[in-house]
Amino acid sequence: MTPDRPVPDRPDTIGPAVDHGAVDNYTPDSGARQEIVWQGKFITVHKRGRWEYVGRARNIRAAVIAAIEDGHVLLVEQYRVPLGRNCLELPAGLVGDDDDCQNEDALTAAGRELEEETGYRAAQLTDLGTYYSSPGMVSESFTLVRACGLQKINSGGGTAGENITVHRVSIASLSGFIASKRSDNVAIDVRLLMLMGAKLLEGELA
């Protein structure tokens, strides 16, 4: 006899069933013509029906790096002009933003950005999938990359014109570190939530 195997919990779907092959059923605006309202070097403003949203120009994507090893994670802090203050983030960078590397892949870009921003080189980079951070107003996606086998090769800090501070933070003390930065008026990147996830949902970080 084959032993009984536990049946995984299935999520409950609440609301009408959606035919994922019928895109026009999603919203009255899904079939509207997409217009380019404005385009710069790095971003494009689109309008489709009633919706206005922003996307990356020239098929530029982003790579976000989760560099976690020996119970520590690498974070970066830098001034962000749209926020008008410093922001605490995971290392990240654009993929295919330079004219001579428009066809580069996310793992290549992630390795380069990790070295430039943090000064660490990864022996292994793993693609953890594509994600969308604010799909109601931004069409940009990012590839989450796990970096392992870290070796310090320089001081990091970014390229010319960047002034990046590198933090190597214990996972065990991460919530306290983030709280301290928040009290110093440092903005917190939403992607840090994945490092805090379970504890945050359980109310341990309230």
Region spans (language model):
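Short loop segments at secondary-structure junctions
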Residues: 69-72, 79, 148-152, 171-172
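Acidic, metal-coordinating catalytic segment for phosphate/diphosphate chemistry
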Residues: 29-70, 78
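Nudix hydrolase/Nudix homology domain
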Residues: 2-21, 25-28, 86, 127, ...
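Conserved hydrophobic/aromatic beta-strand scaffold that supports enzyme active sites
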Residues: 45-47, 66, 75, 144-146, ...
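Acidic pyrophosphate-coordinating catalytic loop
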Residues: 36-41, 81, 131-142
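Conserved Nudix-box catalytic region and its N-terminal flanking loop in Nudix hydrolases
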Residues: 56-112, 158-160, 164
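Active-site-adjacent beta-strand/loop module that shapes the phosphate/pyrophosphate-binding cleft
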Residues: 44-47, 134-153
